[in-house]
Amino acid sequence: MSSKLPKKSEENLELPTFPASEESLSRSEKLKYVFVRNPFIPLGCLMTVGTFLASGYYIRRENHLMANKFMRYRVMSQGFTLAALAFSVLFIGPPRREAPSNSSGSINSEIKK
């Protein structure tokens, strides 16, 4: 009974590296990097904004029960966002940066300058 599933390897779990100079990236590339690195943080932000807007809608319609319910959902979505942020910091770690290119190939030459 052979399994057709690919074997997990550390190569598949590699996170993208952030370039040494952030000025070389466009906004869309930075946003793509954030979504790839931890998609739950932007998702939590969108959930928070959505529930906040929905509660505002129900406040204007004077449906205070639904407005209160969506305010509770907003607090839960903020908690989800903070949990995703904490998970990112604790388990994924800080973003890895590419090493700056050194023309001489030696660290000591940079120290002497």
Curated annotation (Swiss-Prot):
GO terms for biological process: mitochondrial cytochrome c oxidase assembly; mitochondrial respirasome assembly. PROSITE patterns: HIG1. Gene3D superfamilies: 6.10.140.1320. The chain crosses the membrane at residues 39-59, 75-95. Residues 12-103 form the HIG1 domain. Its main location: mitochondrion. GO terms for cellular component: mitochondrial inner membrane; mitochondrion. Keywords: Membrane, Mitochondrion, Transmembrane, Transmembrane helix. It is a multi-pass membrane protein. Residues 1-27 are annotated as: Disordered. It is found in: Mitochondrion membrane. The keyword Isomerase does not apply. It holds the Pfam family HIG_1_N. This is HIG1 domain-containing protein C25B8.07c, mitochondrial. It comes from Schizosaccharomyces pombe (strain 972 / ATCC 24843).
